[in-house]
Regions:
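Extended two-metal-dependent nuclease catalytic cores across DNA- and RNA-processing enzymes
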Residues: 47-48, 71-249
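Short intrinsically disordered terminal tails
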Residues: 1, 250-251
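Domain-level signal for Mg2+-assisted phosphodiester chemistry and nucleotide/NA-binding surfaces
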Residues: 1-86
Length: 251
């Protein structure tokens, strides 16, 4: 069994766990990082008799180039940033795609693998790969049974941590009620945006930023993490949502 590690999350966890213990030395932080990584591998072996992990880390995301407000409100920790750069220097087996966040890369890899475990504290990732495990050593592998419904709910609600507004005054419970009325599908999500009088540009922005690159929402999708394939999929992602949103708003 393959484990896809959201290594951005692992780096954060190791950094803050070390700081909480009064340790600010990068080498000590790396020891924590290695312990967390080993724990993930051990869980795979304990549950599936064999296992391997792939450490995925974010590159510079195209989303910030298109929408500068994306994650603008997040506070930057310069020490954490320096530790992240240190990790990139000493780990030779990191999977980095220059224009994609780890979310996009993990989602694409998970679809290609078909059966894998995503290790992350980011709840969004388990909406797109339901077999998941949080990062802490004592966490167990779980399954998000309603992951497809959670995808649609999030498209309406947005993601405040990433500065994605969603529909004003629509929380998870309201989103569920609206989807019960309209139908549990992407077309209904866009119809709800339209009927709530959210502008077409804002609707498109929200859906583009929330939804990761995946087969279902990329025109002419091709699996691959090289530069040309990545660009193809980014453009296909934009075309898919632009055509779908425009069609429904113009009805």
């Amino acid at each position: 069994m393959i484990g896809l590690l959201d290594f951005d999350g692992y780096i954060c966890k190791a950094f803050y766990a070390s700081i909480a213990r009064g340790e600010d030395d990068f080498e000590e932080m790396v020891k924590v990082l290695d312990d967390l990584t080993k724990a993930a591998l051990d869980k795979l072996k304990d549950n599936f008799s064999h296992g391997a992990v792939i450490k995925v880390i974010s590159g510079h995301t195209y989303k910030k180039d298109v929408y500068p407000s994306y994650k603008l409100g997040r506070k930057r920790n310069e020490d954490l940033g320096a530790f992240r750069e240190y990790v990139k220097l000493i780990y030779e087996d990191l999977k980095v795609v220059p224009n994609l966040e780890a979310d996009d890369v993990i989602t694409m890899m998970a679809e290609d693998l078909g059966n894998c475990i995503v290790f992350s504290d980011d709840k969004d990732l388990r909406y797109y790969n339901p077999q998941y495990c949080k990062i802490n050593i004592n966490e167990e592998i779980g399954y998000e049974a309603d992951y497809k419904k959670k995808q649609l709910i999030q498209l309406l609600v947005g993601d405040k941590e990433d500065d994605i507004a969603g529909i004003p005054k629509v929380g998870e419970k309201t989103a569920e009620k609206l989807l019960d009325m309209y139908g549990w599908n992407v077309d209904s999500v866009i119809e709800i945006y339209r009927d709530k009088q959210v502008t077409i540009d804002e609707c498109l922005k929200n859906l583009l930023l929330i939804s990761p690159i995946r087969k279902e929402n990329v025109i002419d999708y091709r699996y691959g993490l090289d530069d040309s394939t990545t660009l193809n999929n980014i453009l296909g992602h934009f075309r898919y949502w632009n055509e779908k949103v425009t069609e429904i708003y113009n009805k």
